[in-house]
A protein has these predicted regions:
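Membrane-embedded transmembrane-helix bundle of lipid-linked glycan/lipid transferases
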Residues: 1-360, 476-481, 488-531
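Active-site-proximal, structured, solvent-exposed surfaces of multi-pass membrane proteins
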Residues: 401-508, 877, 882, 912
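Intrinsically disordered, low-complexity coil segments
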Residues: 80-88, 132-140, 146, 175-179, ...
């Protein structure tokens, strides 16, 4: 989400947005002032070039992993020498398949930390080459400065953890190599260059950390540190393969630990350098243990790190090196080759990421719309896209407005010229002057200027800590922008000077690639620094709109992508609205026909108007989804004030006319099945599709699935009217008796695009994944679809296309479960053939120990092997009959009570059914024939049957055996 916002600001012309105004429901958040953004820029660059956001992120993950593995290979090659190529390969594979690295990729999605892990072996490699004299010192120094500067911009926590390790390594190498003053000087120069390159980030990070609340530190003390330390039961994962889960603390793999111990035992010569690596391994491992808790809690740096298991980043560098020593212990080259193959193969098998159980939040659009980000914050409570609100300004004491007597709106006239997250340009007229607030947190770096050049001091006001400016009496042109603090500007210039120096030095030592990249960054950075703030012009509404609480000053419109219209109204609040504000945005074509209508609450349905203090200038936002296949042209926008039930409270207001680009045509699959079902009063299920290639049952249209496989149902919803709630949807797989065997319940639509964001006239896709449980018997399962209110669990009524109610859910056509099993082994063979349907292989019979008597029960198990499906669903009959005595027992029912009807039988399928029959209480004593057959329930016609010799059987009945019924006298 942060990456999507970064790309959004690039498109607005802002290269490095320290302040992100779209976060925290439009109140803003200084996330990129305190969170290192380098990997965000890599992903954002790919996305800007047209790669879907999820794809760009996956690509950067792969790039970082492979780059880190190559760096580990180079570092290990430096340490092991020319004879250690196999050992270096083992180290690279051990790094690439380190469980913590893979957990960061597949479980945590921690792209910044993965980027930092990729840099660590390269930094150590460059440091070693600098101190060991492998290259000209200037070349190694430039390389080290660039890599270490990149680390500072990649992951802040790793930057806290790694410098002590690097400093110790440099000193060890310097001492081991004869303590050269020149090499030490170049090392210090490289460290200084890295600090200068990243000064624009780390200087404000440290100097301005006091601008933030202490929530993150408090949470670290109370929760993060105590719950994320190792104890004796959580150090090592003993599973094969390694079990990747969300459980914390993260663990070492047993194979990792065994190889490390074996490698340490294999070291032939304990140089100072290898003793240092042993110390790093022991220190990092011990520091994650519960015994180190006082050290973590007693250090501000420890509290900032939050999770002690982040030291696994350092262990992910040292442990692979020990694995390489296991190979070096093998003296013969043949043994080393075998050892490399065995260790690499074992690492791949043991620590491979088995994470198919995880879901994905990737959006279907390939991007992350602003509205989706706002809704995510509101639904999860992760304001600022993080659980701890670690970058919340200290002036904000609450996220919900708490009125005070001094919070009043001064009488004033405001004519708005321009407004955006970067500032405001307005003409403010007031006889007495007064405070103008913005729906933005106060944070240092804002600058307020009047038209005559007078500077006003921005301050914080209200319990929210809103940005506020006291405007003097009279009529003034007020311009409020955010150029940043003086310290931020100074640190930025220090970075440019350092970068220019490194470009010159890199060119001099013939590092032309480094020099070229640095020169490009200088150019881009210079343009970013020289660029002024971009304030978006505001349009005046065609008709005035006002309530007792607020007035519409203007609006702006952006078509973010062809199918998504953003409307940004600007309000001035005279008094805090006491009732929930719901607005309807209607788009009409040139003939006056409605194209779409969306109804929602303020700021992408993430904020309440009761959070707006008096005297506040509100930069609001709404999303309107445009229907597929909309033609380009001019469209009219009307504004509706609605009550809680979406009923109009006053006549609609003409906002204006906007030119829209054409939207993409609707994509209809040939596998789409039409439905036209209405759910409640606002939603319609137009169609559904069973996604993925599915074999069809022979002679039928039934999809076939094996037990253990997953079905994906894609539903196509549309809104008849704007939904009043974010309904939850479900698809349940049920058996013939209605019992649920698998289900998927979630917020209808997608997590980032729930029902209340749906406008009319547009199809909304919704997917449900259902895994057929292992061991599910062959037969039919029915998917049942519905919607319900999450709080009450009350389902919405379902009506068909004629308006007739069909219940509170709808059963879709069934699927056939068919899993080939063991061959049938009946106790008694029969081999009777029912036409092209099936062969009755045989049966089992279990009689009471006392024999059959009137009223007693006995069990019959039938074994069929299907030859193909029947044209109709036949009924099976089992009769215990004698012509003279009549019927002693009878059972007529579809096979398996309808769970596996004959129309769904597949060639080769074995159908086994156990039946319980009861002898009639008034049955006469005597000998009866137990026989079975099949008939069509529509006309009663029995299916012809042949015996094993191919001869027709009389009355189309298969005689199984004769059973005697006895009387018992008391």
């Amino acid at each position: 989400m942060r990456i999507a916002l970064l790309v959004h600001h690039w498109r607005q012309g802002l290269f490095y947005p320290r302040w992100v105004p779209e976060l925290v429901a439009g109140l803003g958040y200084p996330v990129l002032s305190y969170y290192a953004p380098a990997t965000y820029y890599l992903v954002g660059g790919g996305h800007l070039l047209g790669v879907p956001l999820a794809g760009a992120m996956a690509g950067v993950f792969v790039l970082c992993m492979l780059a880190g593995a190559l760096g580990m290979y180079r570092l290990a090659s430096e340490l092991f020498g020319d004879m250690g190529r196999g050992a270096s390969l083992v180290a690279a594979v051990a790094y690439l398949y380190a469980p913590y690295l893979l957990a960061n990729v597949y479980v945590r999605g921690a792209i910044a930390e993965v980027g930092a892990q990729a840099l660590l072996p390269w930094i150590l490699w460059a440091a070693r080459r600098l101190m060991m004299g492998a290259d000209r010192p200037a070349v190694s120094a430039v390389t080290l400065a660039v890599l270490l500067g990149a680390l500072a911009l990649t992951h802040t926590v790793t930057l806290i953890l790694f410098p002590p390790l690097l400093a110790g390594y440099l000193l060890v190498l310097w001492w081991q190599q004869g303590r050269s003053a020149s090499r030490l000087g170049w090392a210090l120069a490289a460290l200084g260059g890295a600090m200068g390159l990243s000064a624009f980030f780390w200087v404000p990070l440290l100097a301005e950390s006091g601008f933030l609340r202490q929530d993150a530190f408090t949470t670290s003390i109370e929760v993060f540190i105590p719950e994320n330390l190792w104890n004796w039961n959580t150090i090592v994962d003993l599973n094969f393969p390694f079990e990747y889960t969300f459980d914390v603390p993260y663990q070492l793999g047993i194979l990792q630990l065994v190889l490390a111990v074996a490698g340490i035992a294999s070291v032939r010569r304990w140089t100072l350098e290898w003793r240092y690596w042993l110390g790093v391994t022991l220190w990092a491992g011990l520091a994650i243990g519960a015994w180190s808790e006082p050290l973590w809690l007693g250090s501000r740096a420890g509290l900032a790190i939050q999770f002690p298991w982040r030291l696994l980043s350092l262990l992910s560098v040292s442990l692979p090196l020990w694995a390489g020593w296991v190979v070096l212990r093998l003296h013969r080259r043949t043994l080393q080759t075998v050892g490399v193959a065995v260790l690499c193969g074992a690492t791949l098998l043991w620590q491979r990421p088995l994470v198919a159980w995880m879901g994905s939040l990737a959006t279907e659009q390939g991007s992350m719309p602003l509205a989706a980000i706002a809704r995510h914050e509101a639904i999860t409570g992760q304001w600022g896209t993080g659980p701890t609100r670690e970058f919340m300004p200290r002036w904000s004491q609450a996220l919900h407005y708490q009125p005070e007597e001094t919070d009043v709106a001064a009488p004033m006239q405001i004519r708005l010229h321009a407004l955006s997250g970067e500032g405001v340009d307005a003409q403010v007229t007031s006889e007495q002057g007064g405070a103008v607030r913005l729906t933005s947190f106060y944070f240092p770096g804002w600058q307020a200027t009047l038209g005559d050049g007078t500077l006003l001091e921005p301050v914080s006001s209200t319990s929210l800590g809103l940005l506020t400016v006291d405007v003097p009496p009279g009529s003034h042109r007020l311009r409020l922008t955010q150029p940043g603090t003086a310290l931020q500007r100074w640190a930025t210039w220090l970075t440019w000077v350092t970068l220019a120096g490194l470009v010159a030095l890199a060119w001099r030592v013939r590092l032309y690639g480094v020099a070229g990249v640095g020169a490009a960054l200088l150019l881009v950075g210079s343009l970013a620094v020289l660029r002024g703030p971009v304030l978006n012009p505001v349009l005046s509404p065609a008709q005035p709109f006002a309530t007792a609480a607020l007035t519409l000053l203007g609006y702006r419109v952006e078509q973010e992508d062809p199918g998504r219209l953003h409307i940004y109204p600007a309000w001035f609040v005279m008094q805090t609205p006491q009732q929930d504000l719901r607005l309807g945005w209607e788009v009409l074509d040139s003939t006056g026909q409605r194209v779409t209508l969306a109804a929602t609450r303020p700021y992408f349905n993430s904020q309440q108007a009761s959070n707006w203090p008096p005297g506040t200038l509100v930069d609001d936002a709404y999303e309107v989804m445009l229907p597929a296949g909309l033609s380009a042209g001019n469209y009219t926008i009307r504004l509706h004030l609605l009550d809680a039930e979406n009923r109009p409270l006053q006549p609609s207001t003409l906002l204006g006319v906007v030119a829209l680009r054409a939207t993409l045509p609707a994509q209809v699959s040939g596998a789409e099945q039409a439905l036209a079902l209405r759910f409640g009063e606002t939603l319609r299920l137009d169609s559904y599709m069973l996604e993925g290639p599915r074999a069809m049952a022979a002679g039928t249209t039934l999809p076939v699935v094996r037990a253990g496989e997953t079905l994906v149902y894609s539903l196509a919803w549309s809104a008849i009217a704007p939904p009043l709630q974010d309904y939850h949807g479900f698809v349940h797989l049920t058996d013939a008796q209605g019992a649920v065997v698998a289900q998927d319940d979630h917020l209808a639509g997608t997590f980032f695009h729930p029902p209340m964001s749906w406008g009319t006239g547009r199809v909304q896709r919704d997917s449900y994944r259902l895994q057929v449980p292992a061991g599910t018997p062959n037969g039919l399962l029915w998917p049942v679809v519905g919607l319900y209110q999450f709080e009450s669990l009350q389902r919405l009524a379902v009506a068909d296309s004629e308006g007739q109610r069909v219940g509170d859910a709808y059963r879709l056509p069934p699927v056939k479960v068919y899993t080939a099993g063991d061959r049938a082994a009946p106790q008694q063979t029969v081999d009777a053939t029912f036409g092209d349907l099936a062969v009755l292989l045989g049966y089992d019979l279990v009689l009471p120990a006392t024999g059959l008597q009137p009223g007693s029960e006995f069990q019959l198990t039938l074994y069929y092997q299907a030859r193909g499906p029947a044209a109709a669903d036949l009924t099976q009959f089992v009769h215990l009959f004698d012509p003279g005595r009549g019927m002693a027992a009878q059972l007529d029912a579809p096979p398996l009570r309808g769970a596996n009807p004959t129309s769904a039988w597949q060639a080769g399928e074995v159908i086994v059914e156990s039946l319980t029959l009861r002898v009639e209480p008034h049955a006469a004593a005597g000998l009866y024939t137990l026989g079975i057959g099949l008939y069509n329930p529509l006309d009663g016609v029995r299916l012809a049957v042949l015996d094993r010799a191919g001869q027709p059987l009389r009355d189309q009945i298969v005689p199984l055996t004769q059973l005697a019924v006895h009387f018992t006298f008391r």
